[in-house]
C-alpha cells in the first residue's frame, strides 16, 4: 500500500508552486507529487520526475513531514 499524501495540499496548489519556483529539481518534485494527487501512479510520478520509485517514496515521506519547501 503506497504512503498517502498529506491532505492539506492538492494538485493545483502544487502545480502553482512549481510554476513559481526557479529551482528545476523542486519543480519536477512538485509536478510528480501533483500527478499522485490527481490519482496517477507512483510509476507515472517517477517518469515525470525522472527518478526511481524509491526516490518518489522518499519525496512523499519528506513532503508529508515538511511540506513543499
Which residue ranges define each predicted feature?
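Short, basic alpha-helical/linker "hinge" immediately adjacent to a nucleic-acid-recognition surface
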Residues: 1-69
Amino acid at each position: 500500500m503506497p504512503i498517502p499524501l498529506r491532505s492539506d495540499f492538492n494538485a493545483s496548489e502544487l502545480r502553482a508552486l512549481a510554476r513559481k519556483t526557479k529551482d528545476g529539481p523542486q519543480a519536477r518534485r512538485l509536478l510528480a507529487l501533483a500527478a499522485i494527487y490527481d490519482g496517477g501512479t507512483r510509476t507515472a510520478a517517477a517518469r515525470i520526475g525522472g527518478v526511481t520509485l524509491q526516490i518518489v517514496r522518499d519525496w512523499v515521506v519528506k513532503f508529508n513531514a515538511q511540506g513543499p519547501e
